[in-house]
């Protein structure tokens, strides 16, 4: 006999998208949030550079064009418009939650710039913007009496009947397997970096929700669109995850050099193009890394804007205020995911997807720097509003019987699930890669 929890909304994931969604749901909705690790171990916490926003109406067209160009014009234009137009309201919400962003002397927001941006439009807090945002969202959500958070609790599967999601199966930190009956299930489990040997992501982010979607026939989109970040700290020692050297340092003037100390590239190229150039240079030089020079940034600014990057490098034996540091590309972000509409609805009834798990097409084939936090927040709020305005459809007797008799104990072997889910995701990405390559051959035949 399986234990059962009943809730209005189940949110699988405690990153910024899951937390912001919980904040924007009505107080009379009972919400259960689960996270595979602790609440602080989401990739939202790791975001360094900042978050884009529409700073003035005059910047709209160039911001839109920068996003489209970086995405190779494969972006969903409506998604891009929604994201940009919603940015100011999101920033206001974050400030109201206590999030602090860098300010000019007159108190106005300070803006920085990153690769492929035509102007400064990125707000930031030192080099830990994601932590600043997500920690304040978490602090707020923990005060909400209608929200329960279960840490070290994994989403094992959803329970569906005739393309309608009825709930989910979860495993708690003490190994208990529980069925969750929910009027709406939200997949916000992050990306797929844990499937890669070298990634900036936490290791436990292995695309569980993507595998579950594949298993249940929920549509995916752009599953092979995986972003490699051009600059992570190079170490010849294996580490849990690659440490990001934020794109903001290049936005502030950092340069890239080959083994002979010669600059070889425009540092503000879009991420995919810069990664390609770095890999070419590494092959040409027969090296495992290239050099990044942060000494072009005034020392005081370097230490105040990027204190954590500076300290990390010092801990690894490099003082970036006095010498170049070794950098190498690593897997960073998943542009593809579970296909959703502009309200974050999947192709299964009562099932939503938000954050890096979802794909609404906003990023196209390559994400513009510092659009990830914004996109996650904007479309999480839209999902919350969609759930709020739609009346709950009570399950049929057939669905109730199916849920009640569903045997969750078949998920007892977690290592088996790990293998099956990783295989599902990797196979689907490989298939999409092959299909893309074939389409390119036809286009250029």
Where does each model-flagged region fall?
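N-terminal Rossmann-like FAD-binding beta1-loop-alpha1 element of flavoenzymes
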Residues: 9-33
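A glycine-rich dinucleotide-binding beta-alpha-beta segment and adjacent secondary-structure elements
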Residues: 150-151, 156-165, 170-171, 305-359, ...
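An anion/pyrophosphate-binding glycine-rich loop and adjacent beta-alpha core
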Residues: 212, 218-318, 386
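Short beta-strand to alpha-helix junction loop
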Residues: 77-88, 121-139, 150, 200-207, ...
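Glycine-rich loop(s) and the adjacent beta-strand/alpha-helix scaffold that form part
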Residues: 184-237, 243, 373, 377
